[in-house]
Amino acid sequence: MNKALKILQERGFIQQCTDLQALSDRMDKGQIAFYTGTDPTGPSLHIGHMVPIFALKHLCREGHKGVVLVGGGTSRIGDPSGKTEMRKMLSYDELDKNAASIQKQIEKFLAKDIKNVRFVNNKDWLADLNYIDFLRDIGSHFSVNKMLSFEAYKKRMETGLSFLEFNYQLLQSYDFLMLNQNYNIELQIGGDDQWGNMVAGSDLIRRKGGGEVFALTFSLVTRADGQKMGKSEKGAIFLDTALVSPYDFFQYWRNTADADVEKFMLLFTFLSIEEIKSVCAGDINKAKERLAFEVTALIHGKEEAEKALEGARAAFSGGGNKDAMPTANLSLSKLNEGIGIIDLFAEAGLASTKSDARRLVEQGGAFINEEKISDIKALIGKEKLDKDNEMILRAGKKRFMRIIFS
């Protein structure tokens, strides 16, 4: 098998390919141009979006040429794949802002490998399409019966599929055709939920007289408990630091289940397979810490990863640097007559509402300086402060907040 494909296969990326042997043979002959796409339906990617981007970086490191297609055109419609209902329609200005933000995130991640990557936006060729010409030239090559056989459409037919979304496959296929004609793209990569759209694009190129092209999909990553990875109790694990802090990002990976550590290291780091196996054969908590550090460094930079590591060590083991912990500032005057435990945890951001804070205390999950507080009427005063006028709050097993009173 071709070296680049073997890397992806050994690290657990590959799910399906239109013709893996033929693709391998083609890549053995020399550099291949390939693309992956992402729709800017939000201001930030989350970690679940990153599997194709990690694969792109692997391929670029092996000398192949990548294109990242930002779907400024397709996002005006919305992809029904994996969705149970129609997406909220965003304004064109919102989509343009999101596209710029997502491109910056990917550029930062690619770092020096960006020299092998081009960014394009499909609104450049989709925004002003003539509908009649498009139906004649492109729509005539699609079978509605075949489209409805794909899982993405079958699922949505049960809950309601708009005609708007039904057009998405034609537009994504047209993207592949345009990239093939203009940039000699021969390979499309993406998540396995895109399989139907990718195969349709390959078929369109063949029907339009193009050469052989390929579709390669990657597994949709799940955790050991069967849940889709990339989510936490607070929601998606976004790359944008305004949405998820580097510390919380680090903690998501640090809290990986034992059974997932090696799999996630293979997919979300560039450590060698030999080193990964060696790390995972040792202390599992050290392996989790290494996983968290490596992924955080790749996404947010080494400096932020080191801060997050120090903060985690300060919170969990009493070592490290307290300054790197998540920190909130409250007025010292709140402690003069005592602040209620429920108010304290709510104001510290460890509970989204006072009702949540109350439940936390009642269920035995509220700690101050590692002392459990189970009385919902407890008043917290200055006796809980350390010499620096600080206290450490803990919610449950893994969420900490350093409170500075001034």
Curated annotation (Swiss-Prot):
Specify the domain of life of the species encoding this protein: Bacteria
- What Pfam families does the record point to? SYY_C-terminal, tRNA-synt_1b
What is the residue range of the motif 'KMSKS' region? 228-232
Residues forming the motif 'HIGH' region are: 40-49
Write out the residues that bind L-tyrosine: 35, 168, 172
Which InterPro entries is this protein grouped with?
A: aa-tRNA-synth_I_CS (IPR001412), aa-tRNA-synth_Ic (IPR002305), Rossmann-like_a/b/a_fold (IPR014729), S4_RNA-bd_sf (IPR036986), SYY-like_C (IPR054608), Tyr-tRNA-ligase (IPR002307), Tyr-tRNA-ligase_bac-type (IPR024088), Tyr-tRNA-ligase_bac_1 (IPR024107)
Cellular localization per UniProt: Cytoplasm
EC number annotated for this UniProt entry: 6.1.1.1
Q: Which GO terms describe its cellular component?
A: cytosol
HAMAP family xrefs: Tyr_tRNA_synth_type1
The family annotation for this protein states: Belongs to the class-I aminoacyl-tRNA synthetase family. TyrS type 1 subfamily.
Name of this protein: Tyrosine--tRNA ligase
